[in-house]
């Protein structure tokens, strides 16, 4: 009964913890973050649902490209495989909602239809910003309330403040950890080995 009273956002964590305690084969959510060959960075890309074409292209990732991800967080976000590698890293920390929100906002800004804009805005708000949202992002009360007010008349800029806060949080917190992670260092190492 107590499990029913837990907030929806804890559902994913409960599933993963349940998988650990029961070692269930049906727990694909959790097995995806346990690489069978932890020394192979490309396995991370496989585990996080890259298509066969994307995997083939990722094998051509140059050392220069992967090294540039360390230049700045925005450089990482501008590179397709940088985003994929960062997403895989965030999944291992159970914090991919920040990147997913940022990406949803970027996609939202491309919306041209007014009717679609309103429905997309409400979907993003309910998924990421609202209190107890399934994938609630970590933003302060003032930002959440300002975004809530923006929902009264959604526009292409209605998430700008919240997106900026999430970007800053990832840049100051998750991004430095990613650059120090074994996963990123393995990607660099593998791309260097392919050149040799």
UniProtKB/Swiss-Prot annotation:
- Top-level taxon of origin: Eukaryota
Which keywords does this Swiss-Prot/TrEMBL entry list? Cell membrane, Cell projection, GTPase activation, Membrane, Nucleus, Phosphoprotein, Signal transduction inhibitor
InterPro entries in alphabetical order: RGS, RGS_RGS8, RGS_sf, RGS_subdom1/3, RGS_subdomain_2
Every RGS domain range: 72-188
Record carries keyword Nucleus: yes
Work out whether the entry's keyword set contains Membrane.
yes
Q: Which residues carry this modification: Phosphoserine?
A: 26
Q: Where in the cell is it found?
A: Cell membrane; Membrane; Perikaryon; Cell projection, Dendrite
**Can you cite a GO biological process for this protein?**
regulation of dopamine receptor signaling pathway
Q: Name one GO molecular function term.
A: GTPase activator activity
Q: By its UniProt entry, which PROSITE patterns does this protein fall under? A: RGS (PS50132)
PANTHER family named among the record's database cross-references: REGULATOR OF G PROTEIN SIGNALING, REGULATOR OF G-PROTEIN SIGNALING 8
What is the role of this chain? Answer: Regulates G protein-coupled receptor signaling cascades, including signaling via muscarinic acetylcholine receptor CHRM2 and dopamine receptor DRD2. Inhibits signal transduction by increasing the GTPase activity of G protein alpha subunits, thereby driving them into their inactive GDP-bound form. Modulates the activity of potassium channels that are activated in response to DRD2 and CHRM2 signaling.
Name of the protein this chain belongs to: Regulator of G-protein signaling 8
Taxonomic path: Eukaryota, Metazoa, Chordata, Craniata, Vertebrata
